[in-house]
Amino acid sequence: MNKNLKHILTLVIALVAINFISGKLYKRFDLTSDKRYTLSESAINVIKDLESPIVIDIFLEGEDFPSEFRRLKKETKQLLEEFSAKNKNIVFNFINPLKNESTRERNIQQLTKRGLTPMQLSVQENGKSSQAIIFPWALASYNEQTVLIPLVKNKIGATQQELVSNSVQHLEYAFADGFSKLINPKRHKIAILKGNKQLEDKYIADFVKKLGAYYFIAPFTLDSVVNHPQKTLADIKAFDLIISAKPTEAFSEEEKLVLDQYTMNGGKSLWLIDAVAMEKDSLYNASGTNFAVNRDLNLTDFFFKYGIRINPVMISTLYSAPITLAMGEGSQSQFQHLKWPYSPLAGSSSNHPIVNNLNLVKFDFANQIDTLKNSIKKTMLLETASLTKLEGTPREVSLKVVTKEQNPQSFNKGNQTLAVLLEGEFHSVYSNRVKPFKLQKAKDK
C-alpha cells in the first residue's frame, strides 16, 4: 500500500472517529464577549424537566426587513437554538404571514384579533424611504395552551436601532416567561385589599389582568376585623401577597395589627401609597389651581418600624413627563405638550429582577421615601433623576407653572427614591405595645 493511500485511510478513519465522538459528546460553545448566547440558570430550570414539545411559531420573517430587525430575527433564532440544545422538546418555526398577497389582509386581521399587534417600520433603501409592516411576536403552544411572546421591548424615545438592542437583551426573559406560563400551573394567591377606599377596579383592571396570567387573584376586605379578628387573620394568611392600591382612608389599629401579623407570618405585601392628596383632574377648573394636602393613612408607625418613611412632600423635577393642555381661545385652541414638573420619570440602576430592563415609570405628584437604619435589607427599585426639589404641603398647585421658566439651580435635592424593596426578618409594630385586641399566637418577629 503506497504512502498516499495510507494517509487517505488514516484521514478517513480520523474523521469517522471525530464524528462519532462529537455525536456522543455534543457541546455548544459561546464565544461572544458578553455571553449573550449562554442561558441563565433560571431560564434553563424552566425547561429542564419538559417532557412534551413546546412548539413556537415566530412571525419575524420577511423580505423587506430593516437591517436592525434582521438582527433581531438572527438573535431570536440563536437564542431558541440554545433552548433547543438544552431540551429537544423546544421546537420552533419562522413564518412569514405576509408572504402571500391573496391571504395577507386576512392574516393581518386574524393575528391582530389574537392580540399580535403589527408594527410599522420605516425602511431606507437606495436613498428612498418606504414603510413595512412586521409582526414582532411568537406564539408558543403546549398541551393545548397557547401564549403570546412579544419580541420587541418598547422604550420611550428610542430609535429603531436602540429599540432592537433593548429587545435583544430582553429576549431570554420573554421566552422563559412564556414557557413558564405554559409549564407551571398557577399556585400562588394574591389578595387585592378593599375597604380603605383603594382604587376602583376599573383603574387597576389591566394590572390585575396581567397578574392573573400567573396567580390566582381575589378581593379581600378587612371590615370583619372588628368582630372576628382571629378569623380575618386566618383568612388573609391564605394569600401569598396582598396589594393595597392607593388607599385614601386611614387604617384602624385593628386593621394594622392584622396586617402586621400577616407580615410576621411570612406574608408579602405591595403598597402603592400617595402621602399627598392631589389629583391632576382637580386642576381642570376655571382657576387651574387646587391645594395639595397631607393624606393621613395612620401608617407612619407601621412603615417606620419596617425601615422606611414616606414623607408628605411632592417631588418636582426637570426630568418629567409633559402635560397636555389646550392653549388658545375658542376654535383657535390647540393641544400642546408642555413641561410639567410634577410627573417625574423614574428609572433604576439596579439589576434586580423586579426592575431589570424596565422602561421609565411615570409618577404623578410623587412623594419622597426615606430609608431608616435597621436590620432590613433595602433595595432602591426606582429613583428620579438628580434635578429635583421637594415641595412641602399644604401648598397650592397651579397649571400656570407650565408658563414659568424654571431655574435649574433650585432643583438641587438629588435623586429621590420612589420605590423600595424591603427584605429580611421584620419586627412587629406592636411589639412591647398595647394591642387593640388579643390574638392567639401573636408574633413579635
Regions found by a protein language model. Give the residues of each.
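Juxtamembrane extramembrane loops of integral membrane proteins
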Residues: 4-249, 256, 274
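Acidic, S/T/G-rich, low-cysteine, solvent-exposed domains in lumenal/extracellular/periplasmic regions
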Residues: 173, 184, 200-445
